[in-house]
Regions:
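Glycine-rich beta-alpha loop elements in corrinoid/cobalamin-binding modules
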Residues: 2, 18, 25, 29-152
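A short, flexible N-terminal coil/short beta segment enriched in small residues
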Residues: 1-20
Length: 152
């Protein structure tokens, strides 16, 4: 199982600390976690190709005001080329009204709300170990078919 933590930064010199923090908190799953940082100035095709080539089963995006439009645009194409991949988001641009975000973004599997470390670790248990269910993970809003469930 491969889990990709993806960040789309405003500039090349910027770094997204959130994805590094999530990876460090879930260090027991280090061999399953991939990390990629991109910029919103890279071509969409370049990023799509790189994400595709990771072979990730789950892709988690860190979403902020400067990248949310870019992430949504990427997601539309990613879902077409990786229809079996699960897509998750976290960050201030998606967590304040996660249900509305999921209704507007049908390609997204779920949103991690609030502080993401414990939630991400629980998602790792779920996806990598096959333990529990999404209904048991606090701090997520997720899609189950046409229904949206809020465990926030």
């Amino acid at each position: 199982m491969k889990i990709l933590l993806a960040a789309c930064n405003a500039k090349y010199i910027h770094s997204n600390l959130a994805v590094y923090d999530l990876r460090a908190y879930a260090s027991a799953y280090q061999e399953h976690i991939l990390l990629r940082e991109y910029t919103i100035n890279q071509t969409k095709d370049e990023i799509l190709k790189d994400i595709y080539l990771t072979g990730a089963d789950v892709v988690c995006f860190s979403c902020y005001i400067w990248n949310i439009s870019f992430v949504k645009d990427l997601l539309c194409d990613l879902h077409k080329i990786l229809p079996e991949t699960k897509f998750w988001a976290g960050g201030p641009e998606v967590s304040f009204d996660a249900e509305a975000f999921l209704r507007k973004t049908p390609q997204m599997t779920g949103v991690m709300t609030g502080e993401g470390e414990k939630t991400f670790l629980e998602l790792m248990h779920y996806y990598v170990d096959g333990e529990g269910s999404l209904a048991e993970i606090p701090g997520i809003v997720y899609r189950d078919g046409e229904e949206i469930h809020n465990n926030g």
